From Swiss-Prot:
UniProt modified residues of type Phosphoserine: S284
Modified residues (Phosphotyrosine): Y15
Keyword field contains NADP: no
Source species of the chain: Piry virus (PIRYV)
The protein's name in its UniProt record: Phosphoprotein
Family listed: Belongs to the vesiculovirus protein P family.
Record's compositionally biased regions (Low complexity): 202-212, 226-242
Comp. bias (Acidic residues): 62-78
């Protein structure tokens, strides 16, 4: 019995079934020694290293594989396998970004005015000319405001526009019957020159327009009031008046005119006529009579007001003459 067995026997002398347990341990130890000696003999005869020597073998294989990888990389970087750069390509530092052409989306085409109807009301959006300086934009705004003030006394809808080198010339042809809202100056037929600095000239039976303020050459706006050719009836009636005033006609029967059908001739001459009634344009007979009783408008004024109320004025004026014809 080995020294270890004797030491265990001494320490466990009082252990129950000690002798039986000790004999079992001795048998297991003898079997382990026999199997180990057999494995060592077979390994020596086959010439292979035991498993505890595989660590050094794996280390050597890793080193050989890394050497092979380095050689393959060097082969890929050889001049024969090098990839030729794209012709005309440059490095990042020499990239000519200033020479690149940049395309921007085109702006929408400019339009002088856009009309639309919002909640039954006509809304016009005016577009200022492009490329104006702040001073020029202010002058353009003043010109529009002056024109709006002038429209209170002059019917611009029936005026004639002439293009001049210095601006626009607007000429209104007066009818033989003056409206109750027309200023006294209109009957004297005195030319009036307005600018954006002179928006409200004095008007009276004996007044004369003051010296006009000259606008810049490209912004001058000339407006003249010229009478239409008087008819013999108006001439005879005016001559009988001590003040040379035209004859005042009795008010029209708008109740019957508003329900009568009128027609508008097309500008092209070969298209169909536009037909309708003033009551239909205003939405009802009561609305048409309410507008007519607010002043002394002409039939053409009633037509234009009705077209604007319906929201089709811009569409009709480019296709038809705005002179209503009643059968």
């Amino acid at each position: 019995m080995s020294s270890r067995g004797r030491a265990i026997q001494k320490a466990l002398a009082n252990y129950p079934d000690f002798n039986q347990t000790l004999s079992a341990l001795n048998e297991m130890e003898e079997q382990t020694e026999k199997s180990f000696s057999t494995f060592t003999t077979l390994s020596a005869s086959n010439g292979s290293s035991p498993e505890y020597f595989l660590g050094s073998m794996l280390k050597e294989s890793d080193e050989s594989e890394s050497v092979d990888d380095d050689e393959s990389v060097n082969d890929d970087l050889s001049p024969e396998n090098a990839v030729e750069p794209y012709k005309g390509s440059e490095g990042e530092d020499s990239f000519g970004d200033k020479d690149e052409t940049v395309f921007f989306e085109e702006d929408l085409p400019w339009s002088a005015m856009v009309q639309k109807t919002v909640n039954g009301k006509l809304v016009a959006e005016l577009s200022a000319p492009q490329g104006l300086t702040p001073k020029q934009l202010s002058q353009w705004t003043d010109s529009v405001l002056a024109l709006m003030d002038l429209s209170k006394n002059i019917r611009l809808s029936s005026a004639k526009i002439d293009y001049l080198a210095s601006g626009l010339k607007i000429t209104e042809h007066m009818s033989s019957c003056f409206s109750s809202t027309a200023p006294p100056l209109l009957k004297e037929f005195q030319p009036v020159t307005l600018s954006h600095r002179d928006t409200s000239p004095e008007r009276g039976p004996s007044s004369r327009p003051s010296r006009p303020t000259v606008m810049p050459p490209a912004r001058t706006l000339i407006l003249e009031n010229t009478p239409s050719t008087p008819t013999p009836e108006s001439t005879s009636s005016a001559s009988g008046s001590p003040l040379n005033l035209p004859e005042i006609k009795p008010p029209k029967d708008w109740a019957s005119i508003a329900i009568r059908e009128f027609s508008l001739n097309p500008l092209s001459g070969d298209g169909p006529q536009y037909k309708g009634t003033l009551a239909r344009l205003f939405g009802s007979l009561e609305s048409a009579l309410q507008y007519a009783n607010g002043g002394n408008p002409s039939t053409k004024d009633m037509l234009i007001a009705g077209l604007r109320r319906k929201g089709i004025f811009n569409k009709i004026r480019i296709k038809y003459f705005l002179d209503p014809i009643y059968d």
